[in-house]
């Protein structure tokens, strides 16, 4: 867990520093295995129909007929219509019941018209005594249903693969774990029988069964499949581990801290599913267009039928145009254009430690002008080392001043506090338990140690309260990149401590990448101006706001937004919550296993600045795929529907219902495959 996550609400600020893959049409309840089995069983019924029934009245070389063969065709076609056509008939019923007719209704209309008219043709040819032969559509019906089933089987496979990364995450957790019971006895139990505070043993190469803390042993953990962290992470006593990560070479004993739905993986999958079910503006638009497409297709189909009846007075040809228009129109390709990309995008993000909670953030990311970042823990490591400490009173020596600093900070998890306490421990300097400790927002904290009322404050507090202090010493230490805190007792400055933080290796590259994208990085920090400027100059950041109170960050974001600029704020999900909410995109960095942060639109599990660029890249690639799919889904229908209606019949370009079904299936498959090719970078 990152340090900037741990400091909770300790406003020490230097002391101030401190994204179901979607509903696929109306056949979401069908598993691709159902379409597969239906296809092969339907194939058994369809082959005799194809052999015994002429195509559009034209007998093909391989076709045969004999006395009673038309009865066999009728019986097999009826079975095929109700069995093979069932998914489409059921889907149409669902769509109509929700008053959202779409692809399933169009297909159901197409096969129903073909079947009913073929029944009429069968009656006319066998019972009416008419000398004229009425052409049936049994051949078209059989090929239509076969192609539709095959298309949906392939499509469901492609759709399933779009969310594959999420599926892989779900498979990371083992089914059993080795639990330690009385007298260190080991017992293999089901994961469902593991409870909080149980101790489990994980051997080399095994998956960590639950989130927990190592209580014995040390190892290297492979978290690549869980958080996207490519390097193995060394873990030892008291370190957090994530369920689903892979243990390296050592055997460790882990105390369980979260199970089931409270575990990291479950939270991530829940957030991703929620994000995938929320509709973005682009998706709402595509849904609307897909809805209109049904009425457009039916209208064009009926118009084409009437026009061809007037032109040719040929019911067979006119009916063929109607059926072809109904089956070639594909609102499904349009309806899936965005959800499939979203399923792929949010899954890839989760797999790489980028949890996209708010889908609209992906769209907004294309228009970001400024990215505002906290300094400590975002641009810097947040691991402070003490570089200088000194007493300003004859009554206390330097070590005693250090002890008072450590005492007052001992209950805090803020990075500065942790740095002081760890330094005191390293020098074997004892410290007392503080009493009546309170945060002073944007300043530091106050409390009582050994009956002394003390305050730890920053330089802004000294200036505002007119304290006398050595300004030359402050400037020298600050220019070296130190965060400086002062100890006050009885309105006297009695001590100083200076702590240095290290800039993260990937911060400079991140800033460079932002500038190359015409995005301006802005540093917002509670630290002193000298430290802020030193870090900013090293990173190449020209826009710096220092010595800020927590509420100042939010008002700065508002100021930038008032000029029409789009802002992304990157910071701690707890202390920076108001700023994250105020920004157009709030990105909580270094969440660790606590991904259920309310204030972030995007949650970065790691504290790696390069993930900011990864999010921007993923957003850009996602939008590119969405636009491609929308153009394909809309463009296909604009071209295919008029062709099916016979607009180019005068030059001999006529599409049969079977070809229409092939094109319709291909349109959806192309959209699915295009979504599947989405990559992080």
UniProtKB/Swiss-Prot annotation:
Q: Which gene encodes it?
A: copB
From what organism does this protein derive?
Staphylococcus aureus (strain MRSA252)
- The domain of life for this entry's organism is Bacteria
Q: Which Pfam families match?
A: E1-E2_ATPase, Hydrolase
Could you provide one GO biological process annotation from this protein's UniProt record? Answer: copper ion homeostasis
> Where Mg(2+) is bound, by residue?
572, 576
Q: Any one cellular component term from GO for this entry?
A: plasma membrane
Which regions are flagged for Basic residues bias?
1-13
| Membrane-protein topology | Multi-pass membrane protein
Residues at the catalytic site: 374
Keyword Methyltransferase among record annotations: no
- Fetch the InterPro entries from UniProt: ATPase_P-typ_cyto_dom_N, ATPase_P-typ_P_site, ATPase_P-typ_TM_dom_sf, ATPase_P-typ_transduc_dom_A_sf, HAD-like_sf, HAD_sf, P-typ_ATPase_IB, P_typ_ATPase
**Which segments show compositional bias classed as Basic and acidic residues?**
14-26
- Name used for this protein in its record: Probable copper-transporting P-type ATPase B
Primary location group: membrane
Q: What does this protein do?
A: Involved in copper transport.
Which top EC class applies here?
translocase
* Family classification: Belongs to the cation transport ATPase (P-type) (TC 3.A.3) family. Type IB subfamily.
| Keywords, comma-separated and alphabetical | ATP-binding, Cell membrane, Copper, Copper transport, Ion transport, Magnesium, Membrane, Metal-binding, Nucleotide-binding, Phosphoprotein, Translocase, Transmembrane, Transmembrane helix, Transport
Q: What is its EC number?
A: 7.2.2.8
Give GO MF terms, alphabetically. Answer: ATP binding; ATP hydrolysis activity; copper ion binding; P-type divalent copper transporter activity; P-type monovalent copper transporter activity
In residue numbers, the region (Disordered) covers: 1-31
Q: Which reaction does it catalyse?
A: Cu(+)(in) + ATP + H2O = Cu(+)(out) + ADP + phosphate + H(+)
Which compartment or compartments is the protein found in?
Answer: Cell membrane
Transmembrane annotation, as ranges:
39-59, 64-84, 102-122, 134-154, 291-311, 322-342, 630-652, 656-678
Keyword presence, Phosphoprotein: yes
